Amino acid sequence: KLFVTKKNIDKGIIFWNQNKKTLLRAEKKFGVPSEIIIAIIGIESKYGSRTGTFKTFDTLASLSLGANKGRRAKFYKDELINFLLMCRENKLDPRKIKGSYAGALGKPQFISSSYRHYAIDFNGDNVVDLWNSNEDVIGSVANYFKKNGWKKNQLIMSNLIYENSNKKYVENESKKTYKPKTSYETFMNNELYTD
């Protein structure tokens, strides 16, 4: 409901129509379908309409070194270092870059380390620009997926079919977490199936 609204769908169609050639080129080069690339850009920044208003240096410095730094201070310190390196490598003024309240940058909302590892010049102008170049944004999102193991035509989702006696495995996996708690083999050994 939050992301799939008529307004967002309409913006996505406009973005898709305006960038068809680039999306097809990225799909051909990286194997990532256009609709996946479109969805990421739409969710992350509403196709570039919300890239952030916070000074990224100030944000990362506060989150890593400030009085209110939290449990993720080391993560943000590493991102601050990556941000400064990214600015030097791309000849950007760190005082002028703006992003999200968490330091995410540009239309794809890459954190600084992701920018350095996955952002690419996809329009051939020798500049990586994730704010103003839809070509670079599209190529970078596709590159991110490819470098993180995306396989063309590989299944990305399926239904899980289980009997009530095995409900505990599904309930355990459904609790909020960043990493799976139950292996595929455990599911299969307990008569849980995918369609």
Identify the meaning behind each predicted range:
Residues 2-139:
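Acidic/His-rich structured neighborhood in mature extracellular/periplasmic domains
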Residues 90-195:
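Flexible, glycine-rich surface segments
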